[in-house]
Amino acid sequence: MLTKKIAAILLFIVAVGSLSFIAPVNAAEQKSILVSAAVSLKNVLEQCQKCFEEKNPDVKIKFNFGGSGMLLNQIKSGAPIDLFISADIRDFEKIDAPDTASATSEKPSTKIIAEGYPKPFAGNELVFIVPKNSEAGPLAFEDLRMDALKKIAIGNPKTVPAGRYADEAIRSGRYEALREKLVLCENVRQVLDYVIRGEVDGGFVYRTDATQAAAGEIRQAFAVSPEMHAPIVYGVGRLTAANNPELVERFIAFMAGPECREILTAAGFLLPKQ
């Protein structure tokens, strides 16, 4: 367990350590927020960041993007994150879920996620994509059984929400025979890359990832029925140990405002009810 925690922290340090070279802080009084977010949100969050920083020049938003499961493990291991945005709002239940050690301890533990969180941030849809020149033409989930589809990329269900939703769809439709075709990936962007390069015959990604792929790189074969998996809801949550809670709350409020909502809808995300 200790080894896993050390590994998670080291991965976090490597991921975040390079940020200072990308965007150095110019003034000592400049404040910063460190956000760990699902990689499927990278494009939209960077646009929201630009809008926020233009209105708040004294603030710098720094991102640590990755698979939601990996980010969750970093947070549970003590990574100094201010804000977490997961592709599966259910991940927040795991963050404060007692492990074996804490469950046997009489000393109460401090909640990692602040009171009142998580909150819904956005929604998405699951689709199946194939390489642009693919001659295989699956039009529905049951077509994935065809012999022409030998390798199907999917995010690792243990750590990648998109893979978890796809796994739920496989189980709900009793398509267990598909498992021998599955190629597990670290995150949904890796699934997309594998399909673009033709290393697999198809893969499950979010509709927004398929939409943002360069024109002609992939082809969307079909949308997975939302009845086959849990609702795809991205969740946002401030950490109790955030260095500047008020500033984090200000950024969360901004992301729920009209500018960021417009960015989300333009990218194909679904909006939560306000």
Which residues does each predicted region cover?
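Bacterial N-terminal signal peptides
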Residues: 8-20
